[in-house]
Amino acid sequence: MRNASQLVAFVNAVAMCFAFTPAEGLPLPACFDHLSTSDTDRKWGWMWGWKDELPEEKRLYYGPVLARKPTFVSMRFLPVLYATFGRAGEADDHLEDVRSGRLSDIARRIIELVTQKGEVQTRRMRAELGITSREGRTQYGKALDEVQRLMYVARVKAVGEGREEYNYTYDLFVRRYPEIVRAAEPIASADARARALARAVKLAGGLTEKQAAKLFDWGEEPLRRAVERLAAARGVVRLERGREAIVVLRRYADAA
């Protein structure tokens, strides 16, 4: 790949991939491995612009989705990943994740601020939340990743010129991508998780259950049900290898 259109075509073909470098121990595609240059600076130069430009145009989705790393998702596959959360579409959907500990209090405040204010810049958001200390900024950065990973909040666009002014605007996922939310409505969360896992296994050829857990962070029981669902449909085979279970495509089972 050497231009934005080729990147879009690549992501459409794989459905989801790491936006930059691979994640350690996770054999899924990473864009840096498919760029038509070996120059690291050029790779970053190309990708840094594309990861702002293409999501703003809604040609790709970008966020910390897989293994909490920067991820590209095709617009066709995005409803499947959104449906894995099984949201009711209510304004207080996030409170269950707060109670369960999946969202921090700062994450809750970010969601509620964006709900009230609409699309808002990072700098203004921090100011509105009263975050000024170094520790507070670190916690805020982690919380912003949390709300994007769980698809409560989505990045909209880059704004500002130069290093000092450069930042992003964010809005609620449901306001930024209403068409994705509508497309996700008919997909049951269990079906969505099975489809997402099937795609990951197809891309990798096989994954240990530990790798799948790191990739999606669904929790032990939803992951177990997704594996069972795929195995029942004869899409994958679950193999015991010592203390670890491996989920592989059926056609690779004999070689695993």
Language model: regions and residue ranges:
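Long, low-complexity intrinsically disordered regions
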Residues: 1-256
